[in-house]
Regions:
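Conserved C-terminal portion of the radical SAM core fold
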Residues: 128, 183-186, 209-270
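Short Fe-S-cluster ligation motifs
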Residues: 117-137
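Canonical radical SAM enzyme core domain
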Residues: 102-116, 135-179, 190-195, 204-210, ...
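Conserved phosphate-donor/acceptor-positioning beta-strand/loop module used by diverse small-molecule
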Residues: 91, 186-190
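Canonical Radical SAM [4Fe-4S] cluster-binding loop centered on the CxxxCxxC motif
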Residues: 76-111
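A structural signal for short coil/turn segments at secondary-structure junctions
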Residues: 121-125, 153, 179-180, 222, ...
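A short acidic, helix-capping loop that chelates divalent metal ions and anchors anionic groups
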Residues: 194-201, 264-270
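Flexible, acidic/Gly-rich N-terminal and inter-domain linker regions that tether
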Residues: 1-81
Length: 271
């Protein structure tokens, strides 16, 4: 895989052209890392990628991944406030309504790619997110990621979507504190005040206790925490009691959000 900036500029100095994917329709200057076009006729050049109309949002400075088999994907959009990086599809939950069903495959290449991507993202980016799967399955590498995010994007608001269980290990929470990102929020789902129901929804025994302990440890380590309650048929009956539980026992969290469902993945069976 290669990561490239999108550009419309045909006059970029040749010495750095290999870092760019040129959006081109007619003239094809040499030396660019890839050539993107909505015109299928431009096939007489190496590293050519024909774009469907759905990609007409691509702008100068967007970042894409390309490979030698003709595949490409958009990783970062300069004008978007919803840039979220999927770090892994692996997870230690199997939530009944998961919109991103977990896999067991080794996708650690995504982590390596993300570490490189951080060096390309503009430091003027206002907000960005990390999600999964479960990002903290990377362990100490996840801490490295937060440190590097601070180094390259110190003014960017970072939202991390996690089940929070890894933070039940206080030493891991302390490592996150030492990474010292100035504006990082951990969004952690709590599906029920009832441990049995929460564990059933996430299909993991003992998850409730680890999640609560993780929330407490993060706050002990001066981290921002948002509790998320996804509303569906397995959580709606407990909603008032769950909110009361949070108000009584977790009043120190920074934010509580009631979330709607994404109608993908396992969701259709558990509306």
């Amino acid at each position: 895989h290669r990561l490239l900036y999108i550009t419309n500029n045909i006059n970029i100095p040749e010495v750095i052209r290999s870092k760019y994917a040129l959006l081109v329709e007619t003239e094809i200057p040499e030396g660019y890392g890839a050539y993107f076009s909505f015109n299928e006729k431009n096939l007489n050049v190496n590293n050519f990628y024909h774009l469907k109309s759905a990609f007409n949002y691509l702008l100068e400075g967007d970042i894409v991944r390309v490979d030698d088999r003709g595949n490409f994907a958009t990783l970062f959009r300069v004008n978007s406030t919803n840039n979220t990086i999927l770090l892994t599809t692996r997870c230690n939950h199997y939530c009944l309504m998961c919109s991103q069903p977990p896999t067991t495959e080794d996708d650690s290449w995504i982590f390596s790619e993300t570490m490189n991507l951080l060096e390309m993202i503009p430091d003027t980016t206002k907000v960005m997110g990390y999600s999964g799967g479960e990002p903290t399955l990377y362990g100490d590498d996840f801490v490295r990621l937060i440190k590097k995010t601070k180094d390259y994007l110190p003014n960017t608001v970072i939202d991390v979507l996690t089940n929070g269980r890894a933070f039940s290990d206080y030493s891991f929470s302390k490592k996150i504190e030492k990474a010292n990102h100035p504006n990082c929020t951990f969004g952690i789902p709590l599906y029920s005040y009832d441990p049995v129901n929460h564990d059933y929804i996430v299909q993991a025994r003992g998850a409730f206790d680890e999640t609560i302990k993780g929330i407490v440890n993060l706050k002990k380590c001066n981290q921002r925490v948002e509790i998320r309650i996804v509303i569906h048929k397995q959580t709606i009956n407990d909603l008032i009691e769950t909110c009361s539980y949070i108000a009584r026992n977790l009043l120190f969290v920074d934010h509580v959000a009631l979330m709607g469902l994404e109608i993908t993945g396992f969701t259709r069976a558990n509306l």
